[in-house]
């Protein structure tokens, strides 16, 4: 598995569930992905006509594609099983939940996949608590390792 990109903003969310989905891509998008020219900035998923689309994912134009290049921020359809889509639609009707892509990778068969997560936004105090907890754990580990 070759990881192309990971979403750094996922730290701001509480992950409830993760799903693996295929992405409907054009040829120049695949070539650009292989060169790791992708940005997750403000990327999210939406339901439209009982299908899930990923919006605001920026895949840079392939530099050798000339006039046949793709639109860098076009909506991309995610390929999931019907039962997964129905389950996600049911959960997304709950307030405060959203779908966010966490990473894009090529699997062992060379197919582009995206891992999406059903998430709930963390509050500011939750983020501070998590930072404090990590800092305390780090201090404990150094104390156990060095003794003082």
Curated annotation (Swiss-Prot):
GO terms for cellular component: cytosol. GO terms for molecular function: RNA binding. PROSITE patterns: SSRP. Pfam families: SmpB. It is found in: Cytoplasm. InterPro entries: SmpB (IPR023620), SsrA-bd_prot (IPR000037), SsrA-bd_prot_CS (IPR020081). Keywords: Cytoplasm, RNA-binding. GO terms for biological process: trans-translation. Belongs to the SmpB family. Required for rescue of stalled ribosomes mediated by trans-translation. Binds to transfer-messenger RNA (tmRNA), required for stable association of tmRNA with ribosomes. tmRNA and SmpB together mimic tRNA shape, replacing the anticodon stem-loop with SmpB. tmRNA is encoded by the ssrA gene; the 2 termini fold to resemble tRNA(Ala) and it encodes a 'tag peptide', a short internal open reading frame. During trans-translation Ala-aminoacylated tmRNA acts like a tRNA, entering the A-site of stalled ribosomes, displacing the stalled mRNA. This is SsrA-binding protein.
């Amino acid at each position: 598995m070759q990881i192309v990109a990971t979403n750094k903003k996922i730290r701001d969310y509480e992950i409830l569930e993760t799903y693996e989905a295929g992405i409907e891509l054009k040829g120049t998008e695949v070539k650009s992905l292989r060169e790791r020219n992708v940005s997750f900035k403000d990327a999210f998923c939406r339901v439209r006509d009982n299908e899930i689309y990923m919006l605001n994912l920026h895949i840079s134009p392939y530099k050798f594609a000339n006039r046949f290049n793709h639109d860098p921020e076009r909506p991309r359809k995610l390929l999931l099983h019907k039962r997964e889509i129905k389950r996600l639609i049911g959960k997304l009707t709950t307030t405060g939940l959203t779908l966010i892509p966490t990473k894009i990778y090529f699997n062992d068969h060379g197919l582009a996949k995206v891992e999406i997560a059903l998430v709930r936004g963390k509050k500011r105090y939750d983020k501070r608590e998590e930072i404090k907890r990590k800092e305390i754990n780090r201090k404990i580990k150094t104390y156990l390792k060095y003794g003082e």
